[in-house]
Amino acid sequence: MNSFKTINLLLILSFLGLAACNSSSDDTDTASETEVETEIDTGTDTDPDTDTPLTTGILHSAYYEFDSENVEVVLSGDNVIIETNGLPNHTSPYWSSDHELFVEPTVTSYEQMAPGNIDDFVGTYTLTVANSPEKASSSSATGLGAIGIAVSGSVIYNDEEGPGIALDNAVGSLDYNGAHTGPQSFHYHLEPISFSEDDSNLVGVISDGFFLYGRKCNSTGDYPTDLDESGGHTSTTQFTQDADYHYHIQNELYLNAYYILFPGDYQGTASAIN
């Protein structure tokens, strides 16, 4: 009888031991998952010992604002590779009339519109920039063609319509997002109100790696007063706890009605958008 009780007691103790092990294992698994989630940081944290930006393995969280259907963003070491199909994620009269995002022209007309449709373009644009870009020793002029990639998927142009030709005479062809087609693709010249209208929203990234925001500064909720000649300054944003350099659409009227996206020079070292 005593032998039977002893066996039962041993079985109970063994069961309790296994339960304790399983509980410990569950706690360990949960802790491991928490650590993994914590390590996948989308911010721009710094090393607490050195205040050095952690560029390797941590993608700047602003890139998560880009439309994932049109834009692919890949962190490669200290660089970011951005590839887009060049198509916007919003409506426009420049889509083919049978496209689901087509709308009738409002601020332009069929007579004024540039030739071609958005969906005529078949290809990609690729830009490689530093994940933590730095200002160059001197500024450099933008050129014709794409100078940045917008969060919508389309590309950003400067304030010229051709070599030394101001945008003035082409404004009538722009849709309500300040964009039109030609010579190869749909692109923005003016404030794109579908995703930034008199606010601090992210507009895109310029080809020197610095982000372009709307006319207002997120850190103050108002128009920044300390912008340089390129519309840039250093402050915190909705994506950073530490201040960093970035551009804004300048709150200066163009032709008494519009706001040019990026009329200034690059303040960093620009890469080609191919």
Region locations from a protein language model:
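Short helix-loop boundary/capping segments
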Residues: 165-177, 181-223
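C-terminal motif of bacterial Sec signal peptides marking the signal peptidase cleavage site
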Residues: 17-20
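Solvent-exposed N-terminal domain segments of exported/luminal and surface proteins
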Residues: 33, 37-43, 47-165
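Bacterial N-terminal signal peptides that target proteins for export
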Residues: 1-9
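Bacterial signal peptide processing site
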Residues: 22-25
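Extracellular/lumenal glycan-associated surfaces
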Residues: 125-129, 150-154, 182-195, 240-255
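Short, low-complexity cationic-aromatic patches
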Residues: 172-184, 228-243
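Long, compositionally biased interface segments
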Residues: 230-274
